[in-house]
Amino acid sequence: MTKNQALRAALDSGRLFTAMAAHNPLVAKLAEQAGFGGIWGSGFELSASYAVPDANILSMSTHLEMMRAIASTVSIPLIADIDTGFGNAVNVHYVVPQYEAAGASAIVMEDKTFPKDTSLRTDGRQELVRIEEFQGKIAAATAARADRDFVVIARVEALIAGLGQQEAVRRGQAYEEAGADAILIHSRQKTPDEILAFVKSWPGKVPLVLVPTAYPQLTEADIAALSKVGIVIYGNHAIRAAVGAVREVFARIRRDGGIREVDAALPSVKEIIELQGDERMRAVEARYLK
């Protein structure tokens, strides 16, 4: 079974599929080892790793090459966050085959204007395109894919933009009609009430995708019980964990005036070498170096 088929089968199964954010291949490998079903190729995390805002500042080629590197490192499906599709429907028609060829099994595209502003800012620009325009972008994406099992996910930002439940449902239905395989509904409310209301009222046939960053109260068991949700994405926990751990270790080294105390608490160099695939390289050396 290919990665694309695995993701499609998971969506069709009715069981909850979990995806963890990653901003480089090493983090993706750790996510796979932890048992997540897939990788979320997060634009927010990649932007943060370059220390720039999540506002389409990084080029498509920068994001695409990282997705290619991640996909080549893990054996689980990669869901690529392509923001607004890097332009209009013409751009989307070009972009989708690039991500498919890079090894992604799905793309998530949101209905904001280009360039976007991050949904996580309370005072950000949350400007949405017309429904008809985004339907065209979805149609372009589905037409451009070579493999029918490649998944196109439409991300509805109406709740983020403060447009209410009715508009969010209207957009979700329109995007399903345009050919989206799933609908990602996003909210930054600190309780799950807004999302739960949307899920309850969702009349569509395609599964929903949730990103519970703002409402961590919902467990996977809670989400699975909703029955309409096919994927849960942990959208930025890798970069947040990395920043917290690095900051703590650096501060401790400065405080201690050296690494003697902190070293025992860190993964060993041997562990890092193992994560680099050293054993595989040594096997190649033994077989082919003459």
UniProtKB/Swiss-Prot annotation:
Keywords: Cobalt, Hydrolase, Magnesium, Metal-binding. It catalyses: 3-phosphonopyruvate + H2O = pyruvate + phosphate + H(+). One of its GO terms (molecular function) is phosphonopyruvate hydrolase activity. Pfam families: PEP_mutase. Optimum pH is 7.0. Active from pH 6.0 to 9.0. Mg(2+) binds at residue 81. InterPro entries: ICL/PEPM, PPH, Pyrv/PenolPyrv_kinase-like_dom, Pyrv_kinase-like_dom_sf. The keyword ATP-binding does not apply. Substrate binds at residues 40-44, 155, 186, 188. Partially inhibited by EDTA. Activity is restored by Co(2+), and to a lesser extent by Ni(2+) and Mg(2+). Unaffected by Cs(2+) and Ca(2+). Activity is reduced by Mn(2+) and Cu(2+). Disulfide bonds: none annotated. NCBIfam families: Pphn_pyruv_hyd. Homodimer. Homotetramer. Belongs to the isocitrate lyase/PEP mutase superfamily. PEP mutase family. Hydrolyzes phosphonopyruvate. Not active towards phosphoenolpyruvate, glycerophosphate, phospho-L-serine or phosphoglycolic acid. This is Phosphonopyruvate hydrolase. It comes from Variovorax sp. (strain Pal2). The lineage of its organism: Bacteria, Pseudomonadati, Pseudomonadota, Betaproteobacteria, Burkholderiales. The gene is pphA.
